Amino acid sequence: MNKDDDKEGMAMFSALIEGIKPITQDKRHFRTPLKTKQEIELKEQQLHANSYFSDTYQPLLPVQGPMRWLDEGVDSLELKRLRRGDYQPDLLLDLHGYRQSEAKLELAALIQACVKQQSQCCCVMHGYGTGILKQQVPMWLVQHPMVKAFHQAPKEWGGDAALLVLIDIGDQPHRR
């Protein structure tokens, strides 16, 4: 090929495309949407809840009498104080109408909120219902490392449809 053939080819090409308009871009470029801060926080909460709470773990809990549990190394006097209602719960979680998966997330969020707000005691109302949450909530609480103890709540805080939970808030001075 020489330069004359090249110029002639370009001239023919220019003559052919004369008057043609370029096509406007109508294709969509799909990009994965960026996750919002709320979605990231929700996913993180689910991950924490799933890592702490297992549905297959069966701890040794009392069959008769009030529902109660005390972590190793915690003074039994703390359980007695919970039973008598000496601790006033700062936070209250009502699980009425929740599914198990939702209840797990809410329970994990409650424990995180207690630690963040330096609340040593909280109340979890699981209700009566079909008894599923009433059975599962104590089993989940036993598995969480921040839970020191729990006891069936006094009548004023829900009776046998609720639990008072004692949370380990770290080295901060204890409040009642």
From Swiss-Prot:
Gene Ontology BP, a term: rescue of stalled ribosome
Top EC category: hydrolase
Designated name of the protein: Ribosome rescue factor SmrB
Role this protein plays: Acts as a ribosome collision sensor. Detects stalled/collided disomes (pairs of ribosomes where the leading ribosome is stalled and a second ribosome has collided with it) and endonucleolytically cleaves mRNA at the 5' boundary of the stalled ribosome. Stalled/collided disomes form a new interface (primarily via the 30S subunits) that binds SmrB. Cleaved mRNA becomes available for tmRNA ligation, leading to ribosomal subunit dissociation and rescue of stalled ribosomes.
Keyword Cytoplasm attributed: no
Keywords from the UniProt entry: Endonuclease, Hydrolase, Nuclease, RNA-binding, rRNA-binding
Any Pfam family the entry gives: Smr
EC number: 3.1.-.-
Source organism, top-level taxon: Bacteria
Every Smr domain range: 93-168
InterPro entries for this protein: Smr_dom, Smr_dom_sf, SmrB-like
UniProt record similarity statement: Belongs to the SmrB family.
Binding partners and assembly: Associates with collided ribosomes, but not with correctly translating polysomes.
GO molecular function: RNA endonuclease activity; rRNA binding
HAMAP family: SmrB (MF_01042)
UniProt cross-references to SMART domains, sorted A to Z: SMR
